[in-house]
Amino acid sequence: MLKNINPTQTQAWKALTAHFESAQDMDLKALFAQDSERFAKYSARFGQDILVDYSKNLVNAETMQHLFALAKETDLQSAITAMFKGEAINQTEDRAVLHTALRNRSNSPVLVNGEDVMPAVNAVLAKMKAFSERVIGGEWKGFTGKAITDVVNIGIGGSDLGPYMVTEALVPYKNHLTMHFVSNVDGTHMAETLKNVDPETTLFLVASKTFTTQETMTNAHTARDWFLKAAGDEAHVAKHFAALSTNGKAVAEFGIDTDNMFEFWDWVGGRYSLWSAIGLSIILSIGYDNFVELLAGAHEMDQHFVNTPFESNIPVILALIGIWYNNFHGAESEAILPYDQYLHRFAAYFQQGNMESNGKYVDRNGNPVTYQTGPIIWGEPGTNGQHAFYQLIHQGTKLIPCDFIAPAVSHNLVGDHHQKLMSNFFAQTEALAFGKSAQAVQAELEKAGKSAAEIAALVPFKVFEGNRPTNSILVKQITPRTLGNLIAMYEHKIFVQGVIWNIFSFDQWGVELGKQLANQILPELADSAAVTSHDSSTNGLINAFKAFRA
């Protein structure tokens, strides 16, 4: 069980509050000028392949000392131990939180209610391996005897975002199968996907633990109807559909052979499920051996997280710096900015991972918190973002801490593209940290031949204040293993922050109310009768919708 410790009542929080009075005027230029070893002191290496540079943050030794004290005073270590031991730390649902067991490559026992889960984890992995090898190798045939060419993953939330992000990130490792992902209940998503596939050579993966998720099952039945228009015989469904589920009865009723049902467990949260059977689409895209490398990379980070003192623990350091900005500097958002086109869904994935985990206003005692919890997470790949929203990060009025992520080695050595990409990666964090003074702007304008009047008019607009904080995460190359490292790093960062904020990070009750109301409204949309059962706004919207569609 997790302890209930209000972070604001700790001595460390009070010390941080006092420290902030002077630290809010901290200047990155001065910090670097005062300490030639700042980069060495405020950076960390993970193995041989990842460098995390957090030196361009508004922190000094005293800041970090108080932050580490906060982690200790909120008993973070016992929370880490409780999670990895399989205690029911998802207390509102009385569940263990063991996505880490899915990638436990040491195969050491992991107990839930006294039972080792590893034999079951390994059995599902072996089943996925055998299935994927038949599909990839062409042994698995469709209803006309043709091999599979396309795979459509039907899921939503964690059953979609994770597999989609990973398959996109690892395109350099993909095989001949073409992957498609359908999530939105908007029929357009499925309709446009079906235009690009052939019923004779398409395999559908229906990803729903309960096999009752409204969006997923609506899309699955649409895919089934489309398929049967071509195949005719319902017996053929079993050759073109597999299930990632635990509801054997519903899976069989759909027409799927339960031998092709891949289970996972209630101790696997949706947003942490890519490591489970939900990752079957990843295996079908990159092959089982590369999936194992992904698991191994995450396991390496798990071991680092469990065994490394907080002062050198990368997820802990990143989490604490995030708390410094969120709770003391008043930052409301964080940007994740990968300088790698293959990582174009990375920020979206951790938008869910972070905001669904820590978007909570009630603490573990059931009381409203009196402090800020989860930040808004957003971002796009560089350099696209530079020509879209970096203006606000550089010269806006909001403090937006940023994570810059880039590989040193590209999978596509096209001309000098990668050098140009990386020059921007390095330049942006330097510009954000150190800015450009009025004197430097004036000198530039004088050199350009501007008049004194023109210079006076332009200088204020061309000054960069700097002092915008960033982390730089430099990866040797994006591989299955290093991607596993990165994903687990961010997962554990989120966990650490939730522990310190005294909230439950592994439930998501905030998604329930809208679903309940949608189920009430759905039958009201079946006819043209005026609706009066809601507030005036909702009634007005529903009735306008009915009038528009008439």
UniProtKB/Swiss-Prot annotation:
Keyword Protein transport assigned: no
Recorded catalytic activity of this chain's protein: alpha-D-glucose 6-phosphate = beta-D-fructose 6-phosphate
Matching CDD domains: SIS_PGI_1 (cd05015), SIS_PGI_2 (cd05016)
Gene Ontology cellular component list: cytosol
Gene of this entry: pgi
Gene Ontology MF terms in the entry: carbohydrate derivative binding; glucose-6-phosphate isomerase activity; monosaccharide binding
GO terms classed as biological process: gluconeogenesis; glucose 6-phosphate metabolic process; glycolytic process
Major enzyme class: isomerase
Protein name: Glucose-6-phosphate isomerase
Pfam family, one: PGI
Originating organism: Vibrio cholerae serotype O1 (strain ATCC 39315 / El Tor Inaba N16961)
Family statement: Belongs to the GPI family.
Active site: E356 (proton donor), H387, K515
Domain of life: Bacteria
UniProt keyword annotations, A-Z: Cytoplasm, Gluconeogenesis, Glycolysis, Isomerase
EC numbers for this chain: 5.3.1.9
Keyword Cytoplasm annotated: yes
